[in-house]
């Protein structure tokens, strides 16, 4: 469920407040939960089962968005505040909403930067893990992953709208080269309800 007022917002796994909110400019400060993690016990791979778990983490985020007739450009940076990876992420994207037969269709293109500490925590393999699992030790550097997202929405009343979205992300070389990762592309899907004040 997404909720937005003149002063605060709740979207997905992020909540925060508006430091600036005008028709053209928005500056937001928020906290989000990044659910990326790895539970070795759930793996079907015998060697992966011998790795350490990777936990999800909380991020403090600063986001700026500029809106015009050409669409919206958004830039954000977030830092791990839970002491898991101690890394950070940065995202820059463009998006524009189109009305199509009563539905909203919003394409979005962007790039996601993930720091060395972030990548190494989630995708690196220590020498101790390598020794007990048989997987090659791996130390990840920072990387950039481009992505495309398509969002569809429909207003069902003055206050409520529903939406669904799909994301395709090309994994950075630093991520896809990890022995923990099988594949070059990550897919994501989501749906929800938005409440408009």
Question: Where do the model's predicted regions map?
Answer:
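Repeated loop/turn-to-beta-strand initiation elements of outer-membrane beta-barrel proteins
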Residues: 7-10, 25-27, 70-73, 102-105, ...
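Outer-membrane beta-barrel transmembrane domain signature
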Residues: 81-162, 167-176, 180-183, 195-197
């Amino acid at each position: 469920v997404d909720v937005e007022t003149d002063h605060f917002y709740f979207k997905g796994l992020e909540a925060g407040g508006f430091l600036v909110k005008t028709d053209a400019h928005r500056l937001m400060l928020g906290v989000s939960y990044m659910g990326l993690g790895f539970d070795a016990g759930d793996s079907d791979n015998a060697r992966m089962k011998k790795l350490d778990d990777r936990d999800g983490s909380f991020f403090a985020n600063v986001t700026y968005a500029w809106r015009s007739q050409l669409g919206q450009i958004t830039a954000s940076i977030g830092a791990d505040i839970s002491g898991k990876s101690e890394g950070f992420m940065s995202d820059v994207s463009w998006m524009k909403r189109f009305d199509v037969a009563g539905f909203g269709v919003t394409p979005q293109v962007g790039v996601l930067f993930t720091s060395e500490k972030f990548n190494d925590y989630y995708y690196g393999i220590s020498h101790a893990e390598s020794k007990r699992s048989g997987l090659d030790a791996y130390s990840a550097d920072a990387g950039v992953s481009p992505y495309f997202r398509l969002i569809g929405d429909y207003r069902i009343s003055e206050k409520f709208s529903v939406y669904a979205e799909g994301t395709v992300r090309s994994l950075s070389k630093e991520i896809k080269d990890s022995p923990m990762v099988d594949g070059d592309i990550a897919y994501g899907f989501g749906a929800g309800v938005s409440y408009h004040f």
